[in-house]
Amino acid sequence: MENDVRNTPQKLYVLGHPVAHSKSPVMYNAVYGKLGFPWEYGLMDCATPVEAKAFLAARDFLSVNITTPYKPEALAAATARAASAKLAHGANILVKKGDALIAFNTDGRGCVGYLERTGFSFDGAKIAICGTGPTALAILHAAAIAGASEVLLLSRDKERARDALDRYVDEFGTLAHATVDLQAAVDGHRSFLTAYDETTFKFGSYTTSTQAITAADLVINATPLGMREGDPAPFDVSLFREGQRAFDVVYAHGETAFAAGAKAAGCTFADGGGMLVAQAVATVQAVCDVSGIDCEFSFDELFEVMANAAGFNV
């Protein structure tokens, strides 16, 4: 199968709306070209869920990356789902293998992996995450696996945050207490059972958890706020404090209100460009693994090729 897939033209896409700003095509085309694969990666902008579902149902691709707002639809289209996608309730990668369509979510791994590259340690850290969608849940899970002592899930509506967190914790507990403990994919990270037992999971709203936001070692915006001009930050940016780390999953949309507030407060800030590259590396590795291809490049080598292609200084 490796030779069939590796040596024949394949179609790969990023699916979402909007996607015109996406750096994915230039990154993936660069790395697949470097690997010598005759694969073509392009944009698939579907304005409605009906269009997105029809595209996924046609399966005219080897792999698809999925961005806002179609991660739940991608999960539903899959015939097999990795734990990362199940727990996030959304997939950001679909890979075809025969009649199967396999779902993964590398958003959390990408976010944590990039921040660790910048020197941030999740071990014992308190993390506040804005949002309750698949990206936020994927990051919440990855932060727990990476060693966070406390993870706070935030929303405008406290009950919405409660519901999302309760559902995640219930599902995480089921997986963590499976017959075989799921080990971490990265050296130094925790197994599912250890992360489940040793992480304190909390929920709140932007108005009821103000002290917790200020006390957090790292505050992450995992909402779409900032993708449109004039979008506010998720919370009152006066809650930022000097010395905090702040991370915004949004990139390539100018300076967001979240970013401006974090910088003004003296936080160490990074946008989603580095996360995009790190989760893209994980995507390449997943596609190669499912396709039975031995990828001869290391994580760092793939990261460098893709970051340079996108013009990211990360």
Language-model segments: what does each one mean?
Residues 11, 40, 126, 149-150, ...:
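Residues at the starts of beta-strands that form the adenosine-phosphate
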Residues 179-270:
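Rossmann-like adenosine-cofactor binding region
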Residues 2-120, 253:
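Phosphate/diphosphate ligand-binding glycine-rich loop within oxidoreductases
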Residues 145-150, 264-268:
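Conserved S-adenosyl-L-methionine
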Residues 5-6, 122-123, 145, 235-244:
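Short, conserved loop/helix-junction motifs that constitute active-site signature segments
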Residues 148-172, 178-193:
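NAD(P)-binding Rossmann-fold cofactor-contacting core
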Residues 16, 103-108, 123-148, 155-158:
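Glycine-rich adenosine-cofactor-binding loop
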Residues 245, 249-314:
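Adenosine-phosphate binding glycine-rich loop
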